[in-house]
């Protein structure tokens, strides 16, 4: 019933204003796919590689599963900039749907132009929003994460410093002004020593 309203909002939305985009997303809660499909049908943004940035931003915030195939196409399309492809991967990462998790696994496979970004999102979401989709097997099969292969190594604790020399000994030392000037030159890069430094 509200699809026509959202289409009009999408037409008028200044997508550079994150609050406007968020307002559409909040209003579309629990019906994101229906709203996205209506907006896509009416605005006709063209093939995924030709979407205007405004439509890509709306798609990012309408977290339904409907645009998954389009987002996957954008993520792997080398005619798009790296930032545009990464934004498509990020858009998939916010979709709470088992298909989104599977698409992300595909994007994290060998040869994918967004393998690194997809892998990072998988690791982030596998213990969070997507934990219920049991990604463990897919992560293990693709060599991304296998908890059984993790080796825990002890971090060596450094030896404690020896005792400091007595103050009397330090006071007996003769200073070397040229060496002191050199040492202070390193310090004044960040600190102020007398009239010099930052």
Go through each PLM region and give its residues:
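C-type cytochrome heme c attachment motif
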Residues: 181-193
